[in-house]
């Protein structure tokens, strides 16, 4: 049954829709790489988002991620293998280490790597994001995976303010 709206009216409404924060959240400034913040924190989710981004990528695909502490340790090497297979550049970092040693989490992740691609390891997530955004070129895509909408980094029981998208917006708006 027809809703009695013209295509122009439908298109106008669609153009005003906003996506969900932290789910394939695209951040872009002309002349710089497209940065996508996504909550992908499981092997399947990481694979799906990387494959979707690869389809649109005209340059290199960067994947920045970490794995949460006090969570399923078995997924850590699986996510590394997926990122290594699907992306051109890997950046490993912290993602809510909770009560675990962030360096140990990164070592666990590295167990899934074959060594075929160089990996940049930076425990400080903000520094890792800075590295990825500055290294990527205009035709590249940078995926920042794992935290998505979360506005904190959980370390030793303390929630520190931390927002991937906000950090990216600040970096993209700064002169290169």
Q: What spans do the regions from the language model cover?
A:
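ATP-dependent carboxylate-amine ligase
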Residues: 1-176
């Amino acid at each position: 049954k027809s809703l009695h709206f013209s295509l122009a009216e439908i298109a106008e409404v669609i153009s005003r829709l906003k996506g969900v924060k932290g789910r394939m959240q695209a951040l872009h400034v002309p002349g710089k790489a497209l940065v996508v913040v996504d909550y992908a924190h499981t092997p399947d989710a990481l694979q799906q988002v990387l494959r979707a981004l690869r389809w649109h990528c005209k340059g290199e695909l960067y994947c920045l991620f970490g794995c949460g502490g006090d969570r399923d340790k078995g997924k850590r090497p699986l996510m590394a293998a997926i990122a290594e297979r699907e992306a051109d550049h890997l950046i490993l970092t912290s993602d809510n280490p909770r009560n675990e040693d962030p360096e140990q989490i990164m070592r666990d992740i590295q167990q899934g790597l074959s060594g075929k691609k160089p990996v940049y390891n930076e425990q400080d997530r903000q520094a890792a994001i800075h590295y990825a955004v500055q290294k990527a070129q205009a035709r590249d895509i940078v995926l920042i995976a794992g935290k998505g909408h979360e506005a904190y980094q959980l370390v030793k029981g303390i929630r520190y303010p931390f927002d991937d998208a906000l950090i990216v917006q600040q970096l993209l708006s700064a002169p290169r």
